[in-house]
Swiss-Prot record:
It is an enzyme of class 6 (ligase). It comes from Leuconostoc mesenteroides subsp. mesenteroides (strain ATCC 8293 / DSM 20343 / BCRC 11652 / CCM 1803 / JCM 6124 / NCDO 523 / NBRC 100496 / NCIMB 8023 / NCTC 12954 / NRRL B-1118 / 37Y). The lineage of its organism: Bacteria, Bacillati, Bacillota, Bacilli, Lactobacillales. Its EC number is 6.3.4.-. It is found in: Cytoplasm. The keyword ATP-binding applies. GO terms for molecular function: ATP binding; ligase activity, forming carbon-nitrogen bonds; tRNA binding. This is tRNA(Met) cytidine acetate ligase.
Amino acid sequence: MQAVGIITEYNPFHNGHIYHIQQAKKLTGADVVVAVMSGNFVQRGEPALFDKWQRTQMALENGVDLVIELPTFFAVQPSHIFADGAIQLLSALGVDNIVFGSEHPEVDFLSIAKQAPTIAEGQEFKNHTQTFASAYAKQLEAETSFKLEEPNDILALGYASAILNQQANIGIIPIQRAEANYHDANFTDEQSIASASSIRLALHKGKTEKIKNVVPEATKVALDTAANTIDFESKFWSMLKYRLTTDTVGQLGQIYQMAEGLEHRFAKTALNDSGPQSYQSFIKSTKSKRYTFTRIQRTLLYTLLNIKVDQMQAAMQDPYLRILGFTSTGQQYLNEIKKQVTLPLISKVDSSLAKSNLRLDYKAGKVWQLLANEGAPTQDVTRMPLYWEK
């Protein structure tokens, strides 16, 4: 069977994702669509609106055949690590191609990746008046003439670089994003496709009815099951502030990505009685020219999850394939490839796995449950892959 891979967050699943799946099958003639999907926390360092099982169900009902979890130690990372982890998993699963959205699908990303500068080389990366991403983009443009600005182009280059670095036998097929741009904040009632960020914004404003033209039935059903959604504003900040005010600066300094004195800035700001009173205002108070909003946000999530440097580094060296769900076609594909798969395949998590290989995902799942409204189910131990009959 020929397989095409897609790398996703589905936060939430919308009509643009259906277009992506359809194009992936059409352009490759694949028999099976394999999605590597972020778990309960996404790349920006935020909890997903719906848990990984709800989002898996949405995917299976709309054309995906096999959903594999992108572990927390890859999912909540800068684009190059996110991409590298996703390609590791798809390569282990034997996919022939990956198809992804891009703002500039005409670009030869593999060619650019071959010319791209090695990350963090050069004096310009020691210039603290700009973010790492800005420094990288400037050096890349100087060496390749390619202006790297858009989020999906950044991920596209990450995928291409990962394929080259891993010598993975995977072809890449960029496609134009359908109608909506990543940063679009609004959409009209006439639109059938909107960006995930604009949908999240509409939900945040309580405009549930507004989004029903831009999401499939499976997402509408999940929206009606409000018990499983995140109570972000009231719970996330309270839990995080507790960590920031009770941990010592030394303890905060052990957290992954807590670099260049960020722990002092975090602790000082959190302990200031007249300081920021919300999560968003806290980030604005602590960010600098050196660190993007998203970088600060990810570091705060690592703090909430208490992920230390050595834990993250060890986990990244020991990846696995956690099966979240499949169709009959996906099950057939797994049976066909399971003897050739180069990473551990995990379908059921018991307490021993939760304390070892999957410890970070298990912890992330428990914290997501705490953040969710009443009624959110357990996320890992005893949960079996979902099955959807096509």
